[in-house]
């Protein structure tokens, strides 16, 4: 997780805008090259067209693999109002875990997705992340969860 790119209150109110804002936060943290931003956003939106990454219980995990990504990375965003992300349970999404991986890292990408899904199954963790006081509070919660690198 790129700590500098965590968004404690995302401004976006719809799916494509959430994805865009999260990728921009990685660009602003100098983890994604400006020239690659639009291609990454397109790849994430294309992935969403295959099936929503809104997995339910207020969580979405937009993810993609792309040639321009050299190292697996991710960030987190939170919405206090909730966003319609076409989640599988039809409920709004409050927590977004974005994952970007190099094209040649299928195993690591799947392992990271598995780790994220394991962690967010915990209803207490989801509640704590939604209620955390700012970025520092969110980071502290992640650090307490075994295996999350911030």
Question: What do the PLM-derived regions correspond to, one by one?
Answer:
Residues 1-150:
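Cytosolic covalent-transfer regions centered on His/Cys nucleophiles
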